[in-house]
Amino acid sequence: MNYAKISQVAHYAPRQVVSNDDLAEIMDTSDEWISSRTGIKNRHLSSDETTSDLATKVAENLLQKSGISAQDLDFIIVATITPDSLMPSAAARVQANIGAKNAFAFDLTAACSGFIFALSTGEKFISSGRYQKGLVIGSETLSKTVDWSDRSTAVLFGDGAGGVLLESASEQHFLAESQFTDGSRGDSLTCGKIGLSSPFSEKGENQPYLTMDGRAIFDFAIRDVARSIKETIESSQLSAEDLDFLLLHQANIRILDKMAKKLGVAREKLPANMMEYGNTSAASIPILLSECVEQGLIKLNGNQTILMSGFGGGLTWGTLIVTI
């Protein structure tokens, strides 16, 4: 049998930090209004770095930490909804930037579930026995997608990237997974709608900005996502008590509070960093994982059992249980 494992982690955020007070100077909001409803205090915003630039920093960090050459990589997957361009992909740009000439590379679009979907995909590549090493990165520059006159969305999002090195292993580390999509509810969270514009079509509508039905997304997370997490835990033949940490998409502190109660786990098992990053979509889980390793909460090769769960646009949601 062929198995995959997470052997290294890394993250990167733009230097510019924008606080709630900074936002209050350009829109009708306040630190109290934002933090009491979301838990967010700050977010990193790019001034000149693209999504592929952020992802490249993560890739370089992963290679430096692991001591492997870029030419040893078999694949690079970048989960993002904010690529530099429709083509070439952000992953292709990363491949060129780091000189990973032997790696195939592609982007995966599943919004805030993107890293989970991408990590599952990378695990399948390695478990096939055909590939040995790959990078899975979540990278976003969401600051270019928000309407900065809309306080209901502009205050929520930030820019950043995080990722992991996947390598072949002799023992099983990916214990259970579940992935879902419900396109019938897709209009509750949208971004980057591109209308038809050829000489042979009616002019379509363009909607470049992110739009969200906040209540619908909150209810979706507490209901559908919580249920799927419970089912994934059950399928692994583990209990919630067996999990060392649950790394959930960093959308809202209230979601984490309610999730802990619904799942019957100590709130301390759900670390949070949206206070400093805001919602970074596909980047949120790998950034959180990398910070937990930096802080010593999670130890690489420490045989800890970690649940990761993402949820967002599509609607999409997915959960992985792994040992690290």
From Swiss-Prot:
Encoding gene (name): fabH
Record remark on domains: The last Arg residue of the ACP-binding site is essential for the weak association between ACP/AcpP and FabH.
GO biological process terms on file: fatty acid biosynthetic process
Enzyme Commission code: 2.3.1.180
Source organism of the structure: Streptococcus sanguinis (strain SK36)
List of catalytic residues: C112, H249, N279
Keywords from the named record: Acyltransferase, Cytoplasm, Fatty acid biosynthesis, Fatty acid metabolism, Lipid biosynthesis, Lipid metabolism, Multifunctional enzyme, Transferase
Record family assignment: Belongs to the thiolase-like superfamily. FabH family.
HAMAP family assigned: FabH
Pathway: Lipid metabolism; fatty acid biosynthesis
Pfam families linked to this entry: ACP_syn_III, ACP_syn_III_C
InterPro entries: ACP_syn_III_C, ACP_syn_III_N, FabH, Thiolase-like
Subunit structure: Homodimer.
Record function comment: Catalyzes the condensation reaction of fatty acid synthesis by the addition to an acyl acceptor of two carbons from malonyl-ACP. Catalyzes the first condensation reaction which initiates fatty acid synthesis and may therefore play a role in governing the total rate of fatty acid production. Possesses both acetoacetyl-ACP synthase and acetyl transacylase activities. Its substrate specificity determines the biosynthesis of branched-chain and/or straight-chain of fatty acids.
MF term (GO), any: 3-oxoacyl-[acyl-carrier-protein] synthase activity
Compartments where located: Cytoplasm
Name of the protein described by the UniProt record: Beta-ketoacyl-[acyl-carrier-protein] synthase III
Gene3D superfamilies linked: 3.40.47.10
Catalytic activity annotation: malonyl-[ACP] + acetyl-CoA + H(+) = 3-oxobutanoyl-[ACP] + CO2 + CoA
Region of interest called ACP-binding, as start-end residue ranges on this chain: 250-254
Chief location: cytoplasm
